[in-house]
């Protein structure tokens, strides 16, 4: 039979200590107290601006077979280099080296998504113009 939690008139300290220890099993609590949010490339922000340093193709994981179009971005705020996915068919053509891009997170909190290994971010804007607007032909790149 399980022991369970202590009961009794003088069990308060033991209960408080146990609760304090058990909080560390919660991932959100862990991240909050250890300050992991500030150690990621965005430093707690939802978006970040950066410069495109090169275009890269990243091979997708098994069982898929494709080359996912990505760019290497040098973030302006902290000079970290990241890989960012370029969504939609043909949008890589709107990007050139040294273009300023706005990058956002991609999918699950701090994890790569789908079959693209090691890519945690996506390109949202190029030179202040939405990538979606460029793709649909509503705006032109300056």
Curated annotation (Swiss-Prot):
Database matches in InterPro entries: NA-bd_OB-fold, Ribosomal_uS12, Ribosomal_uS12_euk/arc
Alphabetical list of CDD domains matching this protein: Ribosomal_S23
GO terms under cellular component: small ribosomal subunit
Keyword NADP: no
PROSITE patterns per record: RIBOSOMAL_S12 (PS00055)
Single GO molecular function: structural constituent of ribosome
Name of this chain's protein: Small ribosomal subunit protein uS12
Organism of derivation: Tetrahymena thermophila
């Amino acid at each position: 039979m399980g022991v369970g939690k202590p009961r009794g008139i003088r069990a308060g300290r033991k209960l408080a200590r146990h609760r304090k220890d058990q909080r560390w099993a919660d991932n959100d609590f862990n991240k909050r107290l250890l300050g992991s949010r500030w150690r990621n490339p965005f430093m707690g922000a939802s978006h970040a601006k950066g410069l495109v340093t090169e275009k890269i193709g990243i091979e997708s994981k098994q069982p898929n077979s494709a080359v996912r179009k990505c760019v290497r971005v040098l973030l302006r705020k902290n000079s970290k280099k990241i890989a960012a996915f370029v969504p939609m068919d043909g949008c890589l053509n709107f990007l050139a080296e040294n273009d300023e891009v706005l990058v956002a997170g991609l999918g699950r909190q701090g994890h790569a998504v789908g079959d693209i290994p090691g890519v945690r971010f996506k390109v949202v804007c190029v030179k202040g113009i939405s990538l979606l607007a460029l793709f649909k032909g509503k705006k032109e790149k300056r």
